[in-house]
Amino acid sequence: MKSPRRTTLCLMFIVIYSSKAALNWNYESTIHPLSLHEHEPAGEEALRQKRAVATKSPTAEEYTVNIEISFENASFLDPIKAYLNSLSFPIHGNNTDQITDILSINVTTVCRPAGNEIWCSCETGYGWPRERCLHNLICQERDVFLPGHHCSCLKELPPNGPFCLLQEDVTLNMRVRLNVGFQEDLMNTSSALYRSYKTDLETAFRKGYGILPGFKGVTVTGFKSGSVVVTYEVKTTPPSLELIHKANEQVVQSLNQTYKMDYNSFQAVTINESNFFVTPEIIFEGDTVSLVCEKEVLSSNVSWRYEEQQLEIQNSSRFSIYTALFNNMTSVSKLTIHNITPGDAGEYVCKLILDIFEYECKKKIDVMPIQILANEEMKVMCDNNPVSLNCCSQGNVNWSKVEWKQEGKINIPGTPETDIDSSCSRYTLKADGTQCPSGSSGTTVIYTCEFISAYGARGSANIKVTFISVANLTITPDPISVSEGQNFSIKCISDVSNYDEVYWNTSAGIKIYQRFYTTRRYLDGAESVLTVKTSTREWNGTYHCIFRYKNSYSIATKDVIVHPLPLKLNIMVDPLEATVSCSGSHHIKCCIEEDGDYKVTFHTGSSSLPAAKEVNKKQVCYKHNFNASSVSWCSKTVDVCCHFTNAANNSVWSPSMKLNLVPGENITCQDPVIGVGEPGKVIQKLCRFSNVPSSPESPIGGTITYKCVGSQWEEKRNDCISAPINSLLQMAKALIKSPSQDEMLPTYLKDLSISIDKAEHEISSSPGSLGAIINILDLLSTVPTQVNSEMMTHVLSTVNVILGKPVLNTWKVLQQQWTNQSSQLLHSVERFSQALQSGDSPPLSFSQTNVQMSSMVIKSSHPETYQQRFVFPYFDLWGNVVIDKSYLENLQSDSSIVTMAFPTLQAILAQDIQENNFAESLVMTTTVSHNTTMPFRISMTFKNNSPSGGETKCVFWNFRLANNTGGWDSSGCYVEEGDGDNVTCICDHLTSFSILMSPDSPDPSSLLGILLDIISYVGVGFSILSLAACLVVEAVVWKSVTKNRTSYMRHTCIVNIAASLLVANTWFIVVAAIQDNRYILCKTACVAATFFIHFFYLSVFFWMLTLGLMLFYRLVFILHETSRSTQKAIAFCLGYGCPLAISVITLGATQPREVYTRKNVCWLNWEDTKALLAFAIPALIIVVVNITITIVVITKILRPSIGDKPCKQEKSSLFQISKSIGVLTPLLGLTWGFGLTTVFPGTNLVFHIIFAILNVFQGLFILLFGCLWDLKVQEALLNKFSLSRWSSQHSKSTSLGSSTPVFSMSSPISRRFNNLFGKTGTYNVSTPEATSSSLENSSSASSLLN
């Protein structure tokens, strides 16, 4: 056995030998280490060149030499390691050629026997390469191995030699303290002091830390105060604690002692140099997450910190920390977070402390939310068809299983199918009638799919499934057998309230038009009722009531039998009216278009007359020769009707035939077709039974009017309808009663357009044919819910013909009898345009001589501005329409905007307007397919070919005016600008627009219009300020001027007059400003403004009446006394109660019909309801009463009193008359009497100006004459503002002679008041009480007039 000393000497010998040999070796040669053992590592490069520095001096190179030493006795290992650690480096060597230094000697690998195996373990800072750390080779008892990482112990010698490798480089962030004073130059990297410190310290650091295995370098990074704290970085492999202490000692020894380095202040921090593992890699909400921190150091001082909240983590119900030491060389700490939430996301720090070392490792984790996608609601039919509920998760989650649960009143299980790879699960339901018992239809069951991950995360979604039973339909049980013209209904009841669609079909599969049936949904079922008000033969057949839910159909069937019976309107009688000689007879007949099995009789009164049947091709007539002699007396009118009875014993009466029995000598006109008549007699006959040529195959329609003139019948009016148009009219009447009218409509519109185009000449000379076409369009416009481009083209082609210039004269004749035909036509065209749906085809554009149309379809939420221009060169007219895109954004997608322009329609619509009101311009109508409640604004520009005279108005055609016959209305429209030839209108709604001239209204831009505006605004403004000042003055002097009952009531009236007029004027000026500035005021706000203006102006008048009655009472009933509270109650009831009652009644009587306000201004309506009378009549009555009171007062003042000289009396009387008029006129509202002059048309504009001036300045008059002219008010104001001396002198002077108060008992005027109504002289009162009473009464009169 060799001694340790000998072994150590041998090792030193080998080291020195190797060093000397290395000096003579070629750099490119491979050098194998010497060994005391025969083993040499094969294929391993034993000598590695580490560094070569090229300089001008001899090159210094560094080598790493691996030496293997084998011992027969393992006890030699520790002494050798101790010896090597005791060496001081570098060890200098000498050679004749070069100097060789040994910088460090480190033990890397130690192999020892362990049973039958050899375990080779790595020293600190070294480890086996990853590729050698196989699971079956590592030392399980001593090593904790994580796949993909270094291991520290192997069971056998590696094939390439037993050498552990240096581990990856780490950067040690270190600091040490120098116990010297800190200088500011150390903060400046360019200062000499900084460079000196840095150089000296780095030199010492390199000498000291050079002994560390894998040392690469050291850098001083800065200095901090606190003595001097040096921060620096050391780049090396992970060192052992023993080595780092040894290196620190060498640093202190190498550094100049003047730096006073404190050995105990060394600290080292490594960041993210530890192994940090997070499981799972992708974290989802609810997972159990493990964070493992591993470092090959022996320390159990490990802590965890949550950086987001600077929170030190401790063991709890959600967090658990486990720390352990493995292999006596590795510290492992594990943080487990249970049921992680998004609030736990952030950066986590694992901190391990060992001596001077702090090892920090940081990891930021994100918590992903779990999103389970599923249909929120589903409806499932209980028809045994499979329905799948699907749930899928978003994100790459490692799901382990999916569970389905259900909760509800009924239990309907399904079959789950889960595809973990696609993160989806399907639950298939197959519900049948047994699982959905009666009454359970509509029951809701909640199905929950819950996804569970391998790490504990759970995500779920609820699917609300409503189970629908197959509908059981119950249809009207009674047989339906009706006759033509009668109504019938079929009721179809479902015991299920859930359905997607309900419709009715004929047996041929034709859908019944939806206008014929209504469907209602109830809690426990549904009901659909097919109602036919006028049955025809087309309704004869079988009908199916169909409830559809998804692909399930429930059908109920009902047969309908319709027996032939002519409709009353289709029975043609002749004559409509006739004259019959009392001794003669007359042929009467009733005709129908289709034959049938009918029993027909004629009836007059209680008598029944037989009928003879006559068939003439398609026309079937029943005739009777009426004998006038059968009537008991002559000069009588007899009504005769036909009575049709069919096989079902249902009957119908024809229109009545009126026979006028007259003596034969009165008859002068005779005609075999028209009949007989007396002079001046006017009768109507159906055109087909008149002298107008007609054929049974193509009968004409309409009526013709004859008048007996002399001995001849003259044609007075011809309203006959040509045969082709009459045929179209009859077809239209039948179409709207047909069950398949929507399918027949396109073909009919095409035939109508072709026929009207061919019959243009006949229409231009036949008012009856023109009226028939209008009736046809009106009937058909109620049919469609959707109109395509082709149908709209046919409609406009028809309209183009009947609006042509050749037909305009026919319109005049037509509207002499039917005034609403033009409005009816316009309404029909608007209804067609509102139903226009272009679908996928381009928007329709139509242009003809008399009508043009443009349209646009809203396809997106950001449409373009709607701009259309229409030009009619033949009429020299044009117009533009603009709707800003901001208003179009409020419309539904696929909405259609349609604008049509008509150059001749205004002349037709305006025939009831005065000629000088007519402005020659287009009529443009704009409609939207879907109604909108959002604010709307349309701008239109018209060319006006009648620019002269009056104010231009923007108007629209209001179909509800004039008992729904229509009329021009300006509500919601105003003129934005106009230069005479062109007018731009702005409106807040859609319909048909045009412009009119208003000759009676001054042009707002004229001098007169501007003058009236200035007077109104300035006057009302002054009035408001004056009234406010009046109220302020009254408030200031109130206590001083209301010391007796009369003064109190006088000032109470004045205050309420001023307050009511102030509020009324404020409302007035606000509304006027809004309308003058063309702001759109909503109808509700306009109604409210009108109500308050009405109420407060009426209050002004009634308080004026109260003041007048108070004056009359105090002057007439001098000795009558009434308490203040009674007078006050009566005054307020009269002043506010009466106006409120009148205003509320007016509003309640007119607003339900929307005729409370005017069309273009917020004030009481006049044209439709005469609501203005609710203001005018009370106001005029009050003015008359106050005028009467004024006359009485002035008359009594003028009456002479005893003892006055005539000249003095005359002067005093004139003064009192002037003062009374000046006070009473503004106070009692006499100026409103001028309003009578403005009511009548054609009134001189001077009266308008006078009326405006007097009334708008009424507030100023009340302030001056009703308030400030009162002596008591003046005295109170003077006293209030401390002018006591002047007031005292004034009082003294006014107490003498002529300054005696004019209404004191001693004054002549007071005596005159006492002599009212024939009483003369004065009262001689002997008691103090009576004197006091007389004084109060006298002062009462004074306070009323002053």
Curated annotation (Swiss-Prot):
Pfam families: 7tm_2, ADGRF3_N, GPS, Ig_3, SEA. GO terms for molecular function: G protein-coupled receptor activity. As an adhesion G protein-coupled receptor (aGPCR) exhibits a large N-terminal extracellular domain containing highly conserved GPCR autoproteolysis-inducing (GAIN) domain. During synthesis, intracellular autoproteolytic processing of nascent chain within the GAIN domain generates a mature protein, consisting of an N-terminal fragment that is non-covalently linked to the C-terminal fragment. The mature protein is routed to the plasma membrane where the N- and C-terminal fragments remain associated, forming the holoreceptor. The gene is ADGRF5. Residues 166-273 form the SEA domain. One of its GO terms (biological process) is phospholipid biosynthetic process. Residues 954-1003 are annotated as: GPS. The keyword Chaperone does not apply. Keywords: Cell membrane, Disulfide bond, G-protein coupled receptor, Glycoprotein, Immunoglobulin domain, Membrane, Phosphoprotein, Receptor, Repeat, Signal, Transducer, Transmembrane, Transmembrane helix. Adhesion G protein-coupled receptor. In alveolar type II (ATII or AT2) cells, required for normal lung surfactant homeostasis. Modulation of both surfactant secretion and uptake by ATII cells is mediated by the downstream activation of GNAQ/GNA11 proteins and may be a consequence of increased cortical F-actin assembly induced by ADGRF5 activation. In the kidney, may play a role in the regulation of acid excretion into the primary urine, possibly by regulating the surface expression of V-ATPase proton pump. Residues 1028-1053, 1112-1128, 1195-1220, 1266-1346 are cytoplasmic. This is Adhesion G protein-coupled receptor F5.
